């Protein structure tokens, strides 16, 4: 069993015993469910020379039950000191409990990594629960820019993380293929089509899409229809162009996502919701629940009275679910609003029977959070669904020290394809995970082309390559040691230097780290972990290169060499597993 999992279970047993004893001496009923409300958090040490693992459980219990945290910490120490795998326990600060684990417990864990059984520690966390993750969902009005890549990679890697930990995952893209923006897209394409037919450069009015990427769509229309569309009325040619434009741009979006290894299982059409009369049925359902009414909205803050005309309209009572205002369900022309479409779409997700529904939104959609929560609360009658909304903050593309501004409307943006052609898939995917999703990310094109520590994917891949080179060299030059290693007869207790043990301790935290990453929907933890593992391995490599006593291959000591080959293999195994989840190539030679 993983060291962290075993320690957590044993702390839980002791915590339950302590809490029950405190409950028995208290008349307060507020402590009845205390065991369920106090999480046991284990942190690996930042100072490996003093302890291995720390927990603040005594401080949490003390705060909840009005006790002295130092006294409780010492009680934990007394009860846990007898466990055979724990070498030492110390109390620090206001009640942190610091554990030193027996050295052989760490070294023995290498066998679990080498035989692959470590995966069992997290492969059933999800218990086959169904998860829907919606990510990207950019309007099909133009190519995806590098800012979209962040949500794309975050969603794709989160899906992979959930799958490898036992969840059933549906990757989804909501296609906004109707409404004003699609009308404007069709008008823009028509002007490009006209340009192709007449040879005269189109003048694109403000509010439309001026990007030259639409010329190719205009060319396709010209090949299929000749000049026929020029003879049709605007409603007639727009109806034709809308479908062609959306289909072409959606195919372009799919192709760009494929470049960086991002895929979706479902592309859900908003237009189909309108065409199938589903929206009306869902609104009727909310009307029965008395969540819909006819009324007037207040004048929006900051809007001039000259531009505001109050009108009676159909509204959803989203404020009773915590939204800051009720939401319109219909436009002035009587057609359904975007919000009404969102309600029908959410209802569809609920009916598909998901246990978790995750929305991944860009920073410009933060205002949607309260609306989505209101919709789910209104529709999920039995509260069976766990909703989570994740915001992906901005990506600042840096070129030569200057931030590049991006806008589809202005036609000035750096596409995913542009960046892919410079740095490739692996760099894009890894770097998008080097910070938590809700933190702004600077994407420096110059640094990410370097073969240095500033290029994190190179740094991790290079650790994998270096470890592999050790094995190849040993196979050719240390046959006896390689035979001991390859027949699983390595003596891990020979790995006794401080640096070797530090590396093993990082390897052993993999499953614990992954458990936290999936439960908090934080795949960036994998990238951060891999960088730490690579750094520790490179440090050991450099030490062994300069000191005969630290070399991986010691020609006069086959048993020590075999143990160090096992350590190098364990490093490769965990890096391979981490890169597999992130969707990055493991290279053998650099």
UniProtKB/Swiss-Prot annotation:
Its EC number is 6.1.1.19. InterPro entries: aa-tRNA-synth_I_CS (IPR001412), Arg-tRNA-ligase (IPR001278), Arg-tRNA-synth_N (IPR005148), Arg-tRNA-synth_N_sf (IPR036695), ArgRS_core (IPR035684), DALR_anticod-bd (IPR008909), Rossmann-like_a/b/a_fold (IPR014729), tRNAsynth_Ia_anticodon-bd (IPR009080). One of its GO terms (cellular component) is cytoplasm. GO terms for molecular function: arginine-tRNA ligase activity; ATP binding. It catalyses: tRNA(Arg) + L-arginine + ATP = L-arginyl-tRNA(Arg) + AMP + diphosphate. GO terms for biological process: arginyl-tRNA aminoacylation. Coiled coil: none annotated. A motif ('HIGH' region) lies at residues 138-148. Its main location: cytoplasm. It is found in: Cytoplasm. PANTHER family: ARGININE--TRNA LIGASE, CYTOPLASMIC (PTHR11956:SF5), ARGINYL-TRNA SYNTHETASE (PTHR11956). Monomer. This is Arginine--tRNA ligase.
